[in-house]
Regions:
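Conserved ABC ATPase "signature" region
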Residues: 142-160, 406-424
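Helix-to-loop junction immediately C-terminal to a conserved catalytic motif
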Residues: 76, 349
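Conserved ABC transporter NBD signature motif
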Residues: 84-96, 357-371
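H-loop/switch region of ABC-family ATPase nucleotide-binding domains
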Residues: 224-225, 488-489
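Conserved ABC ATPase signature
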Residues: 164-168, 172, 428-432
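ABC ATPase C-loop
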Residues: 181-182, 445-446
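Catalytic Walker B motif of ABC-type/P-loop ATPase nucleotide-binding domains
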Residues: 189-192, 453-456
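The feature captures the beta-strand-to-loop junction immediately N-terminal to the Walker
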Residues: 61-63, 334-336
């Protein structure tokens, strides 16, 4: 929601956000809860009042940085046990204040999936990770084995059971963490951006698992930007703005709010049909297929020939990979979790060495060591490439390192404004929310001035306004002739930013498909929509 928009309570009348529920029917309650992190001047949460019944599925949404993750931390006890600050008000789980729970007992009752799944692993093997929580509960070996097999079946990850965690893709790691929490059988599930790295098939699998849990009377709290997969699952939608609850609706009431109004608030599509409609509007205003992606322009394209990439003790992750991406075309690299998309991106940018084949840019074959300066990777986990002490310094450093011969079309100030980073200028990048870190990393990449830009899941953790802003900046780079490849599972972003899709399956690419009204249905099926 922009600062100039009317308060939600005026624009559309929501339900009372402080509805009183009989005490016996409360699974989670927050009463006049406010919170300020240590070393921060302002409160991240302000006077939150929310009651959640057992068996409800509640969706928390709102613009990046509005306080969703912080609210979930008050419920699972990470605030105040891990994240220190000033907490006011009362947070209760099962009618008992969180401050009176032991950390072990609360972890058994409230199962959590964090925004960054990498931070949640404690074992190097998938099977050991799935067993870990059950072992801590003192369950018998037979029961642990039963739960492990049930959880991998429910989440469709049987083939990952005997894999090493370090071998998994981001989406596969996310599914393993979801399965490990499922195996512990908590009464309350708190999921923070659980689909950030998931493909459509995995999202549908997660939705089915949550529907099963809901039918069993489990309470589900999901903090999320990508909303379409929750439309048939949610009971209520809670929209947050600047640390407070701006409105609460039933799922039916929320879906009845006009799409354009929800977009104005910075919220993503509630139904896949809304994404389709937005895509067709884009088709009618722009010619997304105006660049012949199947033809290589020798002096302006990114090209691979016979590319093969493998990890030790494994078959090739990328095998015999040939493709061309012409400058002036935005290509979305799509494929299931574990298909090899991130591995391919790491190779293109010189982080991962190829076993065979070549990577060419502007007609010149580049060795691994030569790629880092000319092909920039905006990583899936942006915290790994943010090094400065403040956001503004991060962008200034990227601007100063710009070695491109192309005209500089971005300035630090313009991107700070466009990506809504101005108010965060003096914050440490690692103190930001996931979406804020993502915007900082992408802004740095735009300022770096590389001849080719590879973005790995750039919209994970981003609301509609920030997603649209990134799409606009990508279009500016496209007009300048920069080669752009975007790895994404985000159908909404794909329709907003890309001209074509490049399917990747089992380490091999298929011919690119222009994004047009005629091909949209085929592309949806490739992504996993029925």
């Amino acid at each position: 929601m922009s600062a100039t928009s009317l308060p939600i309570s005026i624009a559309v009348s929501p339900r009372n956000t402080a509805v009183t529920v009989p005490p016996a029917d409360i699974a989670v309650s927050l009463e006049h809860v406010s919170f300020r992190y240590n070393k921060e001047e302002s409160e991240v949460l302000e006077d939150i009042n929310l009651s959640i019944r057992p068996g409800e599925c509640i969706v928390l949404t709102g613009e990046s940085g509005c306080g969703k993750t912080t609210l979930t931390r008050t419920i699972n006890g990470l605030i105040p046990l891990v994240y220190q600050g000033v907490l006011k008000g009362r947070v209760s789980v099962a009618e008992k204040p969180v401050t009176e729970w032991t950390s072990g007992d609360l972890a058994v009752t409230v199962g959590s999936v964090f925004q960054n799944p990498r931070s949640q692993f404690v074992n190097s093997e998938v099977e050991a990770e799935l067993a870990f929580g059950c072992e801590n509960q003192g369950l018998s070996r037979e029961e642990i084995v039963r739960r492990i097999h049930e959880s991998v079946r429910v989440f469709g990850i049987e083939e990952l059971l005997h894999r090493q965690v370090e071998e998994l893709s981001g989406g596969q790691r996310q599914m393993v963490i979801l399965a490990s929490v499922y195996a512990t059988d908590p009464d309350i599930f708190v999921l923070d951006e659980p689909t950030a790295a998931l493909d459509v098939t995995s999202m549908r699998c997660l939705g089915a698992a949550l529907a099963k849990l809901k039918s069993m009377g489990k309470t589900i709290i999901v903090s999320e930007h990508r909303l379409w997969w929750l439309a048939d699952l949610a009971d209520r939608v809670v929209v947050m703005e600047d640390g407070h609850i701006a409105g609460t609706w039933s799922a039916k009431e929320f879906g009845a709010i006009p799409f354009e109004t929800r977009l104005h608030w910075g919220l993503r599509a509630w139904k896949v049909d809304e994404v389709d409609a937005a895509a067709h509007r884009r088709f009618s205003h722009t010619s997304v297929s105006g660049h012949p992606v199947h033809e290589c322009v020798a002096d302006t394209s990114l090209r691979t020939r016979g590319l093969r990439v493998s990890y030790r003790h494994r078959d090739a992750v990328i095998d015999s990979c040939d493709f061309d991406i012409s400058a002036g075309t935005v290509v979305g690299l799509v494929g299931a979790n574990g298909a090899g998309k991130t591995t391919l991106a790491r190779c293109l940018c010189g982080i991962q060495k190829e076993a065979a084949g070549t990577v060419e840019l502007a007609g010149k074959a580049l060795r691994t060591s030569q790629r880092a300066g000319v092909i920039y990777l905006a990583m899936q986990e942006p915290g790994y490439q943010l090094f400065e002490h403040t956001v503004v310094r991060e962008l200034e450093e990227a601007h100063d390192r710009n070695g491109s011969d192309l005209p500089q079309i971005f300035s630090v100030k313009s991107l700070m404004d466009d990506f809504r980073l101005a108010d965060l200028a003096q914050r440490h990048p690692l103190s930001l929310s996931g979406g804020q870190r993502q915007r900082t990393s992408i802004a740095a990449g735009l300022l770096y001035g590389a001849q080719a830009l590879v973005m790995d899941e750039p919209t994970s953790g981003l609301d509609y306004n920030n997603m649209a802003s990134i799409a606009r900046q990508i279009d500016r780079l496209k007009q300048q002739g920069v080669v752009i490849c975007i790895i994404t599972h985000d159908y909404e972003f794909l329709c907003a930013a890309c001209d074509a899709v490049l399917p990747l399956h089992d380490g091999r690419v298929s011919p690119p498909i222009p994004l047009t009204p005629e091909t949209l249905g085929h592309i949806k099926r490739l992504l996993g929509f029925s």
